[in-house]
Structure formats: C-alpha cells, structure tokens
Design a protein with these regions (language model features):
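Glycine-rich beta-strand-to-loop/alpha-helix junction loops that act as flexible
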Residues: 179-180, 207-213
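Short acidic, glycine/proline-enriched helix-loop-strand junctions
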Residues: 196-206
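C-terminal non-catalytic interaction appendages of large macromolecular assemblies
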Residues: 211-222
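Acidic/glycine-rich phosphate/pyrophosphate-binding loops and surrounding catalytic core
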Residues: 1-172, 176, 188-193, 220
Length: 222
C-alpha cells in the first residue's frame, strides 16, 4: 500500500510450489514500487493460478513473507540512500538480532535493500564483548585466547567503549574495532584519531560504529 522495494519472491515461490500453484511475477525482485503515483494507489505484482483451496492455503503465508521482507528491504534502501546523500561511501550493515527462525529471510532482505548482512551467526566471526574481556582480564588477553582457537581466515571483532580500548585492540591484532554507543561527534573524533595514530604502522583494521543510530540522526555520525 505504500512505496517500497519488492522482496521475498524466491521464498513466496516455494510456498506456491508446495501448494501446486502457478505464479507469474509482473514485477522483478528488488524493484522499487510507487503505488502512491497510481490512480488507485495499487500495483499488481503477480498473478497466481490454481485451485481455490490451494490459493487460500498459500495466501496468508506468502503475503506475510512478502510484507515482512519487503519492509526490511525498503528500510534498508532508505537507510543506504540517506547515507549516500550525506556523502558516506562506506558500508551500512544489519545486525545478528533477527526474528527467531527468520534470520535467513531477513538477512536476504537486507541484501536486496542494498545493505551488508554482517555476520550470519556466531560461527561467522569472533566478536569479543565486555563480558569476554572482563572474564579474561584485558582486551589483549581476550584476543590472544581467541587467536589460539580460530583458523587464520576467521576475523576478530572487538567492542570498545573508548579510544584507549580501541588502541589496545588494534595493537593486539583485532581485525574490526566496534566503537559502541559513541555520540556522533565523539565517533568522528575517535575515528580520525585512530586513523592518524595507526597510519603507516603496518596495522590493517576496519572501524565500525554501533548503537544509537537512527534515520533521524544518521547524518550526525557520517
């Protein structure tokens, strides 16, 4: 009913297939729809053929999938669009905090909308948070312990609350530094200082920020 990105076609197709239905898509996955520009406020996206009882069985589940994923893709599209308009050329990523049982679908919807899916689950990358650091005594020790049990291809991300912690994590060999719950201005200062501090010191790392970001204040962090 509102403008947005169509998403979830492959999953809806599986529902229709299992219900012995034929579907013809009139709009492609990832297309931006603008029903607000039509005379009746609607856009026909597909035609489904089959027995009435089978259509009724598939109707609600397929619509729920399309609505859920299209909503996520649309929000992702709006977010990355605003970031680009602010001049940001880096990556915008979703989180692992997805709806139970729907992670694959929701991560897919993020990608359709144009943002990165980040890690899929806990096995995708080591992330050291405050509890891990507290239990080992220091960021350096936590990273050392992690390196002992992971392969060379697995990255380590460390959540930090200050520049001091970030510098320790970089020195210890972290691949990604998450600046957590920084203010917009504080983030810019910390990021610039870290880049200057480690310039030409043979340390390669990504900076990531998380916490407190919304569409309304996104420009303050970029």
């Amino acid at each position: 009913k509102s403008d947005g990105v169509l998403s979830g076609v492959p999953f809806a197709n599986e529902v229709y297939n299992q219900c012995n239905l034929k579907v013809e898509w009139l709009i492609e996955e990832g297309d931006f729809l603008q029903p607000s520009l039509t005379t009746n406020g609607k856009i026909e996206i597909a035609k489904v053929e089959g027995k009435v009882k089978d259509i009724l069985v598939a109707e609600r589940l397929s619509l729920n999938i399309l609505c859920r994923l299209s909503g996520i893709s649309t929000q992702s599209y709006i977010t990355i669009k605003k970031a680009r308009e602010c001049g940001y050329k880096g990556i915008i990523a979703g989180t692992r905090k997805t709806t139970p049982g729907l992670r694959l679908l929701e991560k897919y919807a993020m990608l359709v909308g144009g943002i990165d899916a980040h890690r899929f689950d806990l096995s995708s990358m080591i992330m050291l948070k405050d509890n891990h650091i507290w239990s080992t005594g220091s960021i350096t020790k936590a990273i050392e312990n992690a390196k002992k049990v992971i392969g060379f291809s697995t990255k380590i991300e460390v959540e930090v609350q200050s520049e001091e912690e970030a510098n320790e994590a970089i020195e210890a060999g972290a691949d990604i530094i998450m600046l957590d719950n920084f203010t917009g201005e504080g983030l810019k200062i910390a990021a610039n200082n870290l880049k200057k501090n480690w310039l030409n010191k043979n340390k390669n790392f990504y900076l990531e920020c998380s916490g407190g970001l919304t569409l309304d204040n996104l420009d303050q962090f970029l």
